Amino acid sequence: LIASRGEVAGRIARTCRRLGVAVAGVHSSADADALHVREIGESIAIGGAAASDSYLRIDAVIDAAKATGAQAIHPGFGFLAENAAFARAVEAAGLIFIGPTPDVIERLGDKALAKQEADVAGVPIIPGSTTPSEDKAEVERIVRDTGLPVMLKAAAGGGGKGMRVVSTFDGLADDIESAMREAKNAFGSAGLIVEKLIPRGRHIEIQILGDGKGNVIHLFERECTLQRRHQKVIEEAPAANLPAALRDRMAADAVRLGKQLNYRGAGTVEFILQDDAYYFLEVNPRLQVEHPVTESITGLDIVELMLRIASGEGLPLTQAQIACHGHAVEARICAEDPANNFLPSTGDIVHVSFPAGDIRVETGVESGSVVTPYYDSMLAKLIAFAPTRDEALDKLRGAVDATSIFGVTTNQAFLSNLLNWPETRKATFHTRSIDESIGQLTAAPSESNREALALGACFWMMRQRKIAARDPWQSRDLTGWHMAAGDAGLSPIPELHLTTAGHSATIRFAPVQANGAMTVGINDDHVT
């Protein structure tokens, strides 16, 4: 049973089917007609649209597993993937949890406990506290002892939530109170830890795999430095300009930590790197969104490895058998408006098409899908692989520009700008680079020539009328143009969706006038 939704549910199902493993899924009321439900085939309705009424219901997910005769549950990512209580409930029901043991999930889910584990394993940790505190006075004392700038972190947090930068002692008490309140609301615990802020660092993470018996290997590193407000935007593998000796040290530390934990399944050890010094951040005890870039450079299927480990086969590879080839970059296409502070965009997807060819596309949407406010805004991931980093970046930017999505606003132009940004091309970025240059990266592109768009649309219409003469909506003698409505007399049929040079436009036509002129509507503008 796949206890997730969207692109990752479909991705896990494809690997299962390739291995001859039967699959079933779950869905909320909002996802009854979702792409992943049809891709999987057998799917159990587990509740209402809100995640708390469906995908986060441990009892409903386990009941679905029993109803389908499942032997194991793969949590995907998000929702219950890092929930120790869920993992325990799965095992208590006599099922296999495809992931780490509940005890390991619990230890890694608390940032303070995870930091203590890293310290015991001899992995460098960021200066600051190692135990959480809900005492405002104690947190303030730790901040002053550590020295500014610092990061306040919700000990029970994750995914970039419950984090607050403190760069001045002015208003410190208010900052602490706000961070505690946010942590309590988001995670049920107000406990904070304090860490020295690494202001211009790089986010490097190591993919590990363990058999749960002390044997752990790594699949090299990923660079996830390009973030907006602690949320990853572009990921790549391997990291650019990373000295081999430094890479080896980081990988060795990640493996050592995994062995100490008797880690089982796939996990990601995250570090913050500044110059040649690096520090432990956290361990994500699950499949990562960005796992495809690692699969691209190693030729391995991480989901397959997770399944084999869970079935008791152990690690099918030794470290010496794993090699890194080429370069891979991933971009997350999201339904959000960069021009409006990345406000999520919801609604019906009128049309979507992704580039064909040598581009890996992982998506949970199609034409006709509905983007609701209940879940994450990510629509798709595009992954480009090439012999060199420059080639991979070029290929990915071309794929982003070639993707057409109508009906909701997306971050495609922002991604295209980012992939062509000098700091990205030279790999001179740090984790605050996007936030410091957000105005430049979200600047609206120059407007396309409206007259050129109108002329191109007219040629398209004339051609359609010639090749579809038997269609009453398109023929020369009878077209849909008589269905004009509105001030400009624009017909609702046909409607042309056009993308060009990074711009998107919805085009409609008015009837041809007696003098041969015609008005063409381009979004909210009109050209005659």
Residue ranges and their predicted role:
Residues A32, D525-T528:
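Mobile cofactor-carrier "swinging-arm" domains
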Residues A254, P292-N515, V520-H526:
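Catalytic cores of soluble metabolic enzymes centered on carboxylation/carboxyl-transfer
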Residues V216-I217, Y278, G516-M518, V527:
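Hydrophobic residues embedded in beta-strands of well-ordered beta-sheets
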Residues L1-V269, L273-E290:
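N-terminal beta-alpha lobe that positions the nucleotide/phosphoryl donor
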